[in-house]
Amino acid sequence: MGNRGMEDLIPLVNRLQDAFSAIGQNADLDLPQIAVVGGQSAGKSSVLENFVGRDFLPRGSGIVTRRPLVLQLVNSTTEYAEFLHCKGKKFTDFEEVRLEIEAETDRVTGTNKGISPVPINLRVYSPHVLNLTLVDLPGMTKVPVGDQPPDIEFQIRDMLMQFVTKENCLILAVSPANSDLANSDALKIAKEVDPQGQRTIGVITKLDLMDEGTDARDVLENKLLPLRRGYIGVVNRSQKDIDGKKDITAALAAERKFFLSHPSYRHLADRMGTPYLQKVLNQQLTNHIRDTLPGLRNKLQSQLLSIEKEVDEYKNFRPDDPARKTKALLQMVQQFAVDFEKRIEGSGDQIDTYELSGGARINRIFHERFPFELVKMEFDEKELRREISYAIKNIHGIRTGLFTPDMAFETIVKKQVKKIREPCLKCVDMVISELISTVRQCTKKLQQYPRLREEMERIVTTHIREREGRTKEQVMLLIDIELAYMNTNHEDFIGFANAQQRSNQMNKKKTSGNQDEILVIRKGWLTINNIGIMKGGSKEYWFVLTAENLSWYKDDEEKEKKYMLSVDNLKLRDVEKGFMSSKHIFALFNTEQRNVYKDYRQLELACETQEEVDSWKASFLRAGVYPERVGDKEKASETEENGSDSFMHSMDPQLERQVETIRNLVDSYMAIVNKTVRDLMPKTIMHLMINNTKEFIFSELLANLYSCGDQNTLMEESAEQAQRRDEMLRMYHALKEALSIIGDINTTTVSTPMPPPVDDSWLQVQSVPAGRRSPTSSPTPQRRAPAVPPARPGSRGPAPGPPPAGSALGGAPPVPSRPGASPDPFGPPPQVPSRPNRAPPGVPSLGAWRLNSPQGKHENRAGKARL
């Protein structure tokens, strides 16, 4: 390793894993570890048991590992195990460890083969292990059993992906030697998440269970199916050995004997077996941790910074002792009052750019929604004239009137003024709704104190409801005042003498087309929604609304005018949204049943939000475009059908002049009333409702809270908030401790360099067999080339039968190469004769293809020269 500090890297990661496992998944740290993946019954758990030297993992048929097991091996003088979920309890009997794993698995997954991604953390202290951190994962399977869901294959795959996709996770791909390696589930998933092979280590199990005459030598030499980090072979205990109580110490000795005695593996014996695998994994994991420490430190620091902000908020709002609760309550009430005032009055700091504040919404109600509601009550022209004619006739009675009666004017005006009550009361209701919404927005900061938040909302809302009655009484009083006296001497009232003149002036204005003053009321983007697909579909244009017309342009530069529409005889109506449309639509139509735009009876205009629609409607009101009344069509049809009630055909010229005079007078006086109401309503609501509520919050809210009872009850935190605060504080301290520990580690040691890349394109080929079972790499001896006998002999001697064609040495015995001169990089030390550079003609380990190839002929000539 180079220094003691580097040897402590793996225990450091173990401590980090324990710390962050204890506080839950919120840490989301990519800690360095080794994930053991493989198919079902590939021998993953047996490899881990060999590491520990004890039987401690559940065994059986089918899927046995049903939850991830985070196994932390720690080199120690004493031997025992600890579970994270059983803190303080030491397990010295490893049979109890097995039972605890099974019991903990069943607690989460059930007893009938269910799986769960929640890991079990097990730490094993032993003098027989090296420092390692491994994760034993469920074996990949295809067919569900027991109560497993039909998608068990994908659930297990998703669980594996949670571990192996992390860049800091080494992948221990376990594959049995007695199955096709190219179809290995472990290597497939490793290739998918680690295409460069930088994190994958291959392990070949069940070498002793291969068919007689076959071996996996070329695979273990990393020649046939190469991996960048290579392969390591191990021999686990068979089920017979386990049933016979063969301990792992004896199994490791048998494994060592197997590699030393097997003719295909003895030259690799020093690089095979469980002890060597454990050593390699320790070295690789340590180097991997060293390489990933800088990134881990940066991630810890960034998480610490984000947590510090939240922890500071908890410090500001968390009273830890009863003496501070009163002070904290006072601070929160003051903060609530300030927030409420800022949302109503507006503020230059911390401006919300995503939605309108309460004050801005109330402003829209005062100056857009309320005027629109007033005009929606606009009287129908024909109905109004009919009512005026009836009033004049009824006032005259049996007599024929010579003058226009002013009582008809007063009767009609009072009837119209009474209609204003409904929009005024609706305006109060809308403002109250916005005030209550603003109160709830301001109390969001108190969500960690649910009792205080609930009580504060109740007190303020109750006060608003109390002021609602007082405000509505005052509004009704304003309407009654208007009804009490008709001020026909008002400076804005045209009077009887000017009524006829005004009618004549309006007619002249229409004919002359007054172009001297054109007031632009509104500009903005709108979408024409009802253009057919054949004509281009819906398009967005820049609209300009004036008192005379509505124009739209290609863009907001207003250079290319598309169309101009006069606002005379136009009205508004709402249009329902389409099935797939998210826009809000309103339409313009002509009251004289004419086409509005080209061959369209109505012009449908679309906005992104309902607020924009309301704002445009208010702008159209200023231009004299009023909304369609619900009963317009019905009343018009009734009037046409009822000929006796139609005054259009029965009015004499004198009555018609009188009706027109009264009509102008009513129009003039109602304009004065509407102007007065539009001016007084915001003032009344501000004085009686909004300002009064602000004053109540500043002066009386705290006293009302104190009168509710025990302040300690009000200041009780919610269980969820207390738990979250405790979790964040634990994580905060864990992150600080982790950064402190990492800062003390010396990471200057030179690690083993990464092996060079290899050609691993074989992983994409599904027909390559598992190991070097035969010279032709066939999975079964029956598929050998016909020129070579099918079975491998038990020794390195010549095989029976005639020598293959092209053999230069015939049946000569094998000639060992000189010590130290072998080109085989996997050979043993020089004092032991290395593997022959060339094979006798009957040895199928090299194959007839090598002897027939130019390379084989070159080796034959080299052998003759040495002889």
UniProtKB/Swiss-Prot annotation:
Residues 825-843 have a biased composition (Pro residues). Residues 136-139 are annotated as: G3 motif. Residues 28-294 form the Dynamin-type G domain. Expressed exclusively in the brain. It is found in: Cell membrane; Membrane, Clathrin-coated pit; Cytoplasmic vesicle; Presynapse. Residues 235-238 are annotated as: G5 motif. Residues 659-750 form the GED domain. Residues 515-625 form the PH domain. The modification Phosphoserine is found at S306, S347, S512, S774, S778, S822. Residues 64-66 are annotated as: G2 motif. CDD domains: DLP_1, PH_dynamin. Residues 767-867 are annotated as: Disordered. One of its GO terms (cellular component) is microtubule. Disruption phenotype: Homozygous knockout mice pups liking Dnm1 are in the expected Mendelian ratio. At birth, pups mice breath, move, and suckle. However, a reduction in the ingestion of milk is apparent in pups within several hours after birth, and poor motor coordination becomes obvious over the following days. Pups fail to thrive and die within 2 weeks. GDP binds at S41, G43, K44, S45, S46, R59, G60, K206, D208, D211, N236, R237, Q239. Phosphorylation at Ser-774 by GSK3B/GSK3-beta leads to inactivation of receptor-mediated endocytosis in non-neuronal cells. Dephosphorylation at Ser-774, through the EGFR downstream signaling, leads to activation and regulates early stages of clathrin-mediated endocytosis (CME). Phosphorylated on Tyr in response to EGF stimulation in cells expressing truncated EGFR. Phosphorylated by CDK5 leading to synaptic vesicle endocytosis (SVE) activation. Its EC number is 3.6.5.5. The modification 3'-nitrotyrosine is found at Y125. Its main location: membrane. Catalyzes the hydrolysis of GTP and utilizes this energy to mediate vesicle scission and participates in many forms of endocytosis, such as clathrin-mediated endocytosis or synaptic vesicle endocytosis as well as rapid endocytosis (RE). Associates to the membrane, through lipid binding, and self-assembles into rings and stacks of interconnected rings through oligomerization to form a helical polymer around the vesicle membrane leading to constriction of invaginated coated pits around their necks. Homodimer; homodimerization is mediated by the dynamin-type G domain which promotes assembly-stimulated GTPase activity. Homo-tetramer formed from two dimers in the absence of lipid. Oligomerizes into a helical polymer that self-assembles around the vesicle membrane, when associated to the menbrane through lipid binding. The dynamin-type G mediates homodimerization and plays a role in self-assembly. The C-terminal proline-rich domain (PRD) mediates interaction with SH3-binding partners. Is required for DNM1 self-assembly. This is Dynamin-1. It comes from Mus musculus (Mouse). The gene is Dnm1.
